[in-house]
Amino acid sequence: MFKTLYARIAIYSITVILFSALISFVLTNVYYHYNLKASNDAKIMKTLKEARQYEQSAKPTHIQQYFKHLGQMNYQIMTVDQKGHKTFYGEPFREDTLSQNAINNVLNNKDYHGIKDKPFALFVTGFFDNVTDNTVGINFKTKDGSIAVFMRPDIGETFSEFRTFLAVLLMLLLFISISLVIASTYSIIRPVKKLKLATERLIDGDFETPIKQTRKDEIGTLQYHFNKMRESLGQVDQMRQHFVQNVSHEIKTPLTHIHHLLSELQQTSDNTLRQQYINDIYTITTQLSGLTTELLLLSELDNHQHLLFDDKIQVDQLIKDIIRHEQFAADEKSLIILADLESINFLGNQRLLHQALSNLLINAIKYTDVGGAIDIALQHSHNNIIFTISNDGSPISPQAEARLFERFYKVSKHDNSNGLGLAITKSIIELHHGTIQFTQSNEYVTTFTITLPNNSL
């Protein structure tokens, strides 16, 4: 029954309607018992006493005819003479529940207030309880002696048309309410079902089909965010496919080259060629090892929850260590490295930050023309730490500039790098809550600028 949200909401709503009707009935019954019952008793008692006063003044020949006439005026009457004979006028009572003690009291000229003294019943409204003890009674003097007269209004006759009207009203109210609940529930569930189908399409790998945003409420917000999620998942899936393709290409090409070199190595007896092939194989395997290391680092950065960023880093000293480590490569190209470094402390992950800054210096050395210069600066700026590294070299096209930080992207197809260095650097800087930007001047001076929060304060 509750396997669908549609059934659950519909049944809950119908249950609320029925429960509300039941509670309303009980509260109305309580209100009648404590607020209306006494006044109703007094009103009927007044009517009965006026009837007795009229009977005594008019002295009708046949008092039975008088009571019969009252019965025809929508009253239910029971008379009891001194011998205990009971006579009923008007519509019959549902049940004769009046005690003999109450009858005797009325015969002894004591008024009976059965309506006011009716005990409270939770699911029975005293106003409609058609029994003889739910009456008022007084003593009538007749020529044959005293009789006890008990009377109550005939609710069934008085409100017969109204009861029919009320019954039709309640039936229509319930029918229309339940119909509207079912219809409104369907209108709520329909977009949820569409979301379910769209989710199933996502599971099957369909990231292209959007769902229409049909509402402006919470469901509409859910539809909007679902489409955003679909787009993000589509981008992630494309990145995954490109990543797999790029990794496959980066591994397949050197492996093919190694296979070719090994074949040549087996077929040649020239020691010079054999040594050259071995050196080439060593170079390629070194590149593969570097690719593996960078892929593992990328995976670590993508799943960074375990990484700690609580190392106290002397940034200027870290940069000096990197320059010293890469000085040999710079000297081979007769490059000058100029460093203007302020003494700055930073709280982060020293291993990762070393990798990020090393990547930038290695790139600068690689792409700077022979005999050129590399400028490095580190300084405070308000609440930030600014690191810049500039070098002169070949210009970079706007198309290439827009993709510099993409994984596996290479400015030149002849570049022997893996195309992961700048992507790794960007991820590391962002994990330190920083930013990295690339700019290029008209003189073909390229500059990378890293901005980090000054968290050492």
Swiss-Prot record:
Its EC number is 2.7.13.3. Gene3D superfamilies: 1.10.287.130, 6.10.340.10, Histidine kinase-like ATPase, C-terminal domain (3.30.565.10). It is an enzyme of class 2 (transferase). Residues 186-238 form the HAMP domain. PROSITE patterns: HAMP, HIS_KIN. It is a multi-pass membrane protein. Coiled coil: none annotated. The keyword Acetylation does not apply. Keywords: ATP-binding, Cell membrane, Kinase, Membrane, Nucleotide-binding, Phosphoprotein, Transferase, Transmembrane, Transmembrane helix, Two-component regulatory system, Virulence. This is Heme sensor protein HssS. It comes from Staphylococcus aureus (strain MSSA476). The lineage of its organism: Bacteria, Bacillati, Bacillota, Bacilli, Bacillales. The gene is hssS.
